[in-house]
């Protein structure tokens, strides 16, 4: 399951939900017919409950959405704080040279001389660009996810090649 965001609050009295998206393209979520909700983003697949998306629109830096089965504010309050996710195959296909963060987490990172720098443990959005969090034991590297440093992303090989030195 790919975690997309989190329900942060009810919105109004008719069951609408305010959503904080974790990615930079929440408008793509409107193309999905269903969302899945869970209390624990790392929980088993069976813990995710499917909801049909009735309506969704941008609101500030996030979204507001209406899910079937959430008819009023009380029902919205009952699911406040839950994570929003979707199976990978339910997601719209990314454009060329675009990636879902969930597809990058867990990839090995190597530099131009094939030195292993670690594995992607997460990403950070800084506003200007995204940053890879690369862990290698006790060492964490923060590598900007921009063309100047990221030379190649090979999802099939589960590897990212970067212009970055091991001692940086």
UniProtKB/Swiss-Prot annotation:
**GO CC annotations, alphabetized:** cytoplasm; ribosome
Please give the superkingdom of this protein's source.
Answer: Bacteria
Q: Which GO terms describe its biological process?
A: ribosomal small subunit biogenesis; rRNA processing
Q: Name one GO molecular function term.
A: ribosome binding
Is Cell cycle given among the entry's keywords? no
Output the Pfam families linked to this UniProt entry: PRC_RimM, RimM
Which subcellular locations apply to this protein? Cytoplasm
For this protein, the record's InterPro entries field holds: PRC_barrel-like_sf, PRC_RimM, RimM, RimM_N, RimM_N_sf, Transl_B-barrel_sf
Question: Which stretches make up the PRC barrel domain?
Answer: 96-168
Report the function annotation for this chain.
Answer: An accessory protein needed during the final step in the assembly of 30S ribosomal subunit, possibly for assembly of the head region. Essential for efficient processing of 16S rRNA. May be needed both before and after RbfA during the maturation of 16S rRNA. It has affinity for free ribosomal 30S subunits but not for 70S ribosomes.
Assembly notes? Binds ribosomal protein uS19.
Q: What is known of its domains?
A: The PRC barrel domain binds ribosomal protein uS19.
User: Which family does the record claim for this protein?
Assistant: Belongs to the RimM family.
Name of the protein in question: Ribosome maturation factor RimM
